[in-house]
């Protein structure tokens, strides 16, 4: 007994030693963080193309909600090769269908390198129900950073951060108004709806105030199978039969895009400026409960895509993966690509099961197989016969002839590999380890299989672009995970909401720029630690920050065009129009200032417009494609500006990247039009006196108002005539009119620069001229001024309006100021030189005296030295030093 006790004690100590050792190992290798973030990566297909390269999953209890998005590469293919590529992909998928039942397990790279002690530790730990420590939360990624980004995303959704309304088309089965979260969302937004006692699930939206607005378009089967009644929908855009509720697809995706469950659980509302266009393509007959198959879904999908294109949406979200390919679908996809519409396919899947299953099986298997529709063989024959008769009578249906290839082709969103505007998202589908029979098999082609019969991890991922994990439980604990039925729906909805919000912040964000921003926000793989071999963390804050920076950069360029003293190419009218589509928030209170300036400029602009109406008939002055004139009556106070002062929308976003406060408001177009107007009326001045493009100026914002502006002459070419245009600064309304000269105007209204050889400055005055010639130059300048007084300041149309006289007087005064300032500068320079000359003369006299005195002293010293030498040698010569002019006595011994 003692011996057995010692052995038992030693075994116990050894087990505890292993437990402590691997507990520390677990802290460094594994994660217990509950996060809801996304992962994004390019070229996932190349990484996981080889056999056996499967994604590492820790345990079956560890698969739940966590999202990692994978985005595939798009190849630029011609339209002719799209059909061939799709067919090749479908043939490849059909070849893999024969190997569906293959349950061989290929271990991943991490599993091959797995330590044997770790396996023993897992086996021993299952005996002890020990909970994991909370300190493990910081072992993966950066827990504080994740929490900060979650708060940042909630702040964006809870506040209206969008600039412009984004139109999104949702194609699916609708939403569930009886759901607690959706019902709570509707109550928070004060949406008025009436319950239909016959059908409690129906919801009639009267106010249309869910977030922004909704528009419903029904492609449901109303009377007979395979027949879509569009008469009511054609007469009224909102069909009577179209409601927010779905009918037979509980795993809806639309409701998850409209709401955010995490925010609603905290009883908070998020505001996003979006306009939803909902097209319902799922449907069934309540009496017969006959389900539709893939050919009907393709017809419904084509009609919904066409309807979304007519509504002018920016994004289309399809509630299921494109199942089969036909010519009509490819044609509509090409049209959407031409309109630059981004299409997102969800992670839900539709498969056509040809097995003989009862309708009851559909409801019994609703837990894991909600997206699979089964049809009786007898019903199929009835439907086919019914279609042949109805297709001859109805012309409003798209012609769709089912062929043998259509029956064989099965692809998981094959269009996304060939069309760059299609983004396909697929997700992990949690399946139980219990196997079904052949008629109830849940393993399909291109579907990720997590578990096999033995409980091993297996991954079969062909054309999969999204997968997700959960870290709700410890990987060593036998605790069931919280499996949500519509996890993949939430994944797709979250990704679509991210794209829509990026577009709402920056309307000019193209597909290429969007891909670059998403790729730039990927965190390095080293920071993920042991999260996954193939996973990349997507930094949400960087995504929105880059979107805002792109928007700020476009506005900053426009600032430079109006405020910078360097010569830059001006923007065209089309670019200016697109710039002003964004309602830039104002950092200071300029509502009253803009209103006062608009009213103050009315009288002056009206006089200019009336006096030169005949000369501007052919010129397009309005910036909004001819929808309004430049100046209207004073009583109406309606000017052609994209965002008037009474429509300024204050936003939470402020562009603080600029170092100065602009005088020119993005909300008002009259200032820019005024510059064009003033330049246009100067083309009739005398071409003998011109100014140069290379004029320099200093704004009163940068330099004091009393500084003197040096004027240079410039030359403007417009239809072969020289233009006399002045670079003015009007102190009356604090508006700075930028230098718009030295440009040629084409027929399309774009501004183009002259060549560099025409930009050489030609000065009225030479700043390095000799002082002796200043009088001659002044006389010449005054003579030129007298000539201009009689000739140059009169326009060819001899206009005597008060405005033109005022402008001429201002030009004369400014020219005189230039002459006086030039003469004063020359005089001041001469005075300074005279003072310097007097100082030099005085210094020369003093130096001359010093030199003479120094020479006399040296001469006397030499003479005294010579006398001393003579006296010492006995020559008898000597010298008597006395006063400066004392007589010198020479003697001999």
UniProtKB/Swiss-Prot annotation:
Main localization, broad class: membrane
Keywords from the UniProt entry: Cell membrane, Membrane
Observed effect of gene inactivation: Ookinetes fail to traverse the midgut epithelium resulting in a reduced number of oocysts in the gut epithelium of the mosquito host A.stephensi. Gametogenesis and ookinete development are normal. Growth rate and development of blood stage parasites are normal.
Biased composition (Polar residues): 791-803
GO cellular component terms, semicolon-separated: plasma membrane
Residues that span the membrane, as ranges: none
Keyword Cell membrane belongs to the record: yes
Function: Probable inactive serine protease which plays a role in ookinete traversal of the mosquito host midgut epithelium.
Annotated protein name in UniProt: Inactive subtilisin-like protease SOPT
Organism, as annotated: Plasmodium falciparum (isolate NF54)
Gene (UniProt): SOPT
């Amino acid at each position: 007994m003692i011996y057995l006790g010692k052995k038992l004690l030693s075994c116990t100590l050894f087990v505890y030693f292993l437990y402590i050792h691997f507990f520390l190992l677990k802290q460094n290798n594994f994660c217990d963080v509950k996060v809801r973030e996304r992962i994004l990566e390019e070229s996932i297909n190349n990484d996981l193309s080889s056999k056996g390269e499967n994604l590492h999953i820790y345990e079956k209890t560890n698969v739940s909600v966590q999202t990692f998005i994978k985005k595939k590469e798009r190849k630029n293919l011609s339209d002719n090769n799209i059909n061939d590529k799709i067919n090749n992909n479908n043939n490849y998928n059909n070849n893999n269908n024969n190997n569906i039942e293959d349950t061989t397990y290929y271990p991943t790279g991490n599993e091959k390198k797995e330590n044997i002690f770790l396996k023993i530790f897992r086996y021993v730990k299952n005996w002890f129900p020990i909970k994991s420590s909370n300190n493990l939360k910081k072992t993966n990624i950066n827990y504080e950073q994740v929490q900060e980004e979650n708060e940042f995303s909630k702040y964006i959704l809870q506040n209206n951060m969008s600039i412009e309304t984004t139109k999104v088309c949702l194609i699916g089965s609708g939403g569930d108004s009886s759901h607690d979260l959706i019902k709570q969302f509707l109550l928070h937004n004060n949406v008025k709806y009436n319950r239909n006692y016959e059908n409690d699930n129906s919801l009639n939206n009267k106010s249309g105030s869910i977030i922004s607005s909704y528009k419903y378009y029904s492609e449901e089967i109303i009377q007979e199978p395979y027949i879509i009644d569009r008469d009511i929908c054609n007469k009224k855009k909102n069909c009577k039969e179209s409601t927010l509720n779905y009918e037979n697809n509980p795993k809806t995706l639309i409701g998850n895009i409209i709401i955010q469950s995490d925010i609603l659980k905290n009883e908070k509302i998020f505001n996003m400026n979006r306009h939803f266009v909902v097209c319902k393509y799922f449907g069934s007959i309540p009496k017969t409960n006959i389900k539709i198959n893939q050919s009907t879904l393709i017809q419904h999908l084509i009609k919904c895509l066409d309807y979304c294109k007519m509504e002018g949406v920016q994004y289309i979200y399809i509630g299921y993966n494109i199942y089969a390919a036909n010519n009509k679908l490819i044609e509509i996809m090409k049209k959407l690509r031409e309109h630059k519409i981004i299409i997102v396919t969800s992670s839900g899947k539709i498969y056509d099961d040809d097995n003989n299953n009862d309708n009851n099986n559909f409801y019994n298997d609703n837990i894991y197989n909600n997206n699979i529709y089964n049809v009786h063989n007898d019903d199929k024959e009835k439907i086919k016969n019914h279609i042949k008769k109805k297709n001859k009578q109805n012309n409003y249906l798209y012609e769709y002839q089912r062929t043998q290839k259509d029956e064989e082709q099965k692809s998981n969103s094959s269009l996304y590999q060939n069309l760059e505007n299609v983004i396909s998202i697929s997700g992990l589908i949690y399946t139980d380890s219990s196997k079904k029979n052949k008629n109830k098999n849940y393993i399909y082609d291109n579907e990720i299989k997590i578990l096999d019969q033995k409980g091993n991890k297996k991954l079969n991922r062909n054309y999969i672009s999204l997968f997700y994990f959960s870290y709700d439980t410890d990987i060593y604990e036998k605790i069931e995970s919280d499996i949500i039925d519509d996890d993949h729906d939430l994944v797709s909805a979250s990704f679509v909401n991210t794209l829509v919000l990026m577009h709402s912040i920056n309307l000019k964000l193209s597909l290429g720029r969007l891909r670059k921003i998403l790729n730039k926000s990927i965190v390095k793989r080293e920071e993920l630690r042991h999260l996954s071999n193939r996973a990349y963390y997507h930094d949400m804050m960087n995504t929105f920050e880059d979107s805002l920076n792109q928007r700020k950069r476009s506005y900053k360029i426009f600032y430079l065009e109006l405020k910078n003293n360097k010569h830059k190419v001006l923007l065209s009218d089309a670019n200016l129009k697109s710039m002003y589509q964004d309602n830039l928030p104002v950092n200071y209170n300029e509502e009253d200032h803009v209103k006062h300036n608009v009213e103050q400029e009315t009288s002056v602009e009206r006089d200019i417009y009336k006096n030169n109406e005949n000369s501007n008939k052919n010129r397009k002055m309005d910036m909004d494609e001819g929808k309004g004139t430049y100046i209207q009556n004073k009583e109406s106070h309606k000017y052609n500006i994209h965002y008037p002062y009474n429509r300024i929308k204050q936003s939470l976003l402020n562009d603080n990247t600029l170092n100065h406060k602009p005088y020119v408001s993005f909300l008002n177009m009259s200032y820019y039009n005024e510059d064009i107007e003033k330049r246009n009326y100067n083309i009739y001045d005398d071409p003998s006196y011109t100014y140069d493009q290379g004029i320099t100026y200093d704004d009163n914002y940068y330099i004091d108002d009393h500084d003197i502006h040096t004027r240079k002459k410039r030359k403007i070419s417009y239809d072969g005539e020289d233009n006399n245009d002045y670079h003015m600064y009007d102190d009356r309304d604090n508006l700075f009119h930028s230098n718009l000269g030295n440009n040629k105007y084409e027929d399309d209204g774009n501004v183009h620069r002259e060549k560099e050889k025409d930009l050489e400055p030609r000065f009225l005055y030479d700043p390095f001229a000799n002082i002796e010639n200043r009088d001659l130059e002044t006389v010449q300048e005054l003579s030129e001024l007298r000539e201009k007084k009689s000739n140059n300041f009169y326009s060819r149309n001899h206009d005597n309006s008060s405005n033109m006289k005022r402008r001429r007087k201002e030009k004369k005064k400014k020219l005189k100021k230039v002459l006086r300032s030039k003469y004063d500068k020359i005089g001041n320079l001469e005075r300074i030189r005279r003072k310097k000359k007097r100082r030099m003369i005085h210094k020369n006299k003093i130096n001359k005296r010093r030199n003479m005195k120094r020479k006399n002293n040296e001469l006397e010293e030499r003479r005294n030295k010579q006398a001393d030498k003579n006296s010492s040698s006995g020559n008898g010569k000597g010298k008597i030093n006395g006063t400066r002019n004392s007589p010198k006595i020479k003697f001999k011994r």
